[in-house]
């Protein structure tokens, strides 16, 4: 229920897919560009879908579930992200930015990855959120 409230209430997504990722010491996800081949509507094909023509129809958000630990990195374009806090949310224009992750540290890094169709609420959230924005997210307690 909390994951649904976040997707629909705060991010304004619908027809979304939610994945829990864990990255342990020594794992990396090489730099890549998303094409959403694994989305259920694409069914691992390279058929052109509406969001290939208009990428704003689908967006991806990542929610960090635990605080950053030494040795963990998140790379997007020319930026390297570290020092995140549990509950921090990042997103990017999936069709334009190469990205990847690595965990050289001792602690496992956990994220929730939302990929879904956008609404006006999604774009309001994106356009009115900065790196300093604060949103009330209670993802750890009942």
Task: Describe each model-derived feature in a short phrase.
Residues 71-73, 82, 92-105, 113:
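Short beta-strand His + acidic residue motifs that chelate non-heme Fe in jelly-roll/DSBH
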Residues 15-17, 26-28, 58-62, 70, ...:
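Extracellular structured ligand-interaction cores
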Residues 117, 121-142:
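Active-site or metal-binding loop neighborhoods of secreted/extracellular toxin and effector enzymes
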Residues 30-34, 41-43, 72-77, 86, ...:
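A short secondary-structure junction signal
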Residues 60-64, 89-93, 106-123:
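A short hydrophobic beta-strand segment most commonly corresponding to one strand
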Residues 56-85:
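A short beta-strand-loop-beta hairpin characteristic of the jelly-roll/cupin
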Residues 1-52:
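Signature of the catalytic double-stranded beta-helix
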Residues 25-28, 35-36, 68-70, 89, ...:
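Short, solvent-exposed loop/turn segments at secondary-structure junctions
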């Amino acid at each position: 229920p909390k994951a649904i409230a976040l997707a629909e209430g705060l991010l304004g997504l619908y027809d979304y897919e939610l994945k829990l990722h864990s990255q342990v010491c020594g794992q990396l996800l090489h730099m890549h560009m998303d094409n959403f081949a694994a989305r259920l509507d694409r069914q691992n094909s390279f058929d052109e879908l509406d969001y290939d023509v208009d990428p704003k129809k689908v967006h991806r958000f990542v929610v960090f579930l635990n605080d950053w630990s030494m040795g963990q990195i998140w790379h997007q374009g020319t930026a390297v992200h570290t020092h995140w806090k549990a509950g921090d949310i990042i997103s990017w224009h999936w069709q334009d930015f190469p990205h990847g992750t690595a965990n050289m540290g001792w602690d496992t890094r956990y994220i929730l990855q939302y990929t879904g169709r956008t609404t006006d609420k999604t774009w309001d959230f994106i356009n009115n959120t900065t790196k300093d924005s604060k949103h009330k997210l209670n993802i750890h307690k009942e």
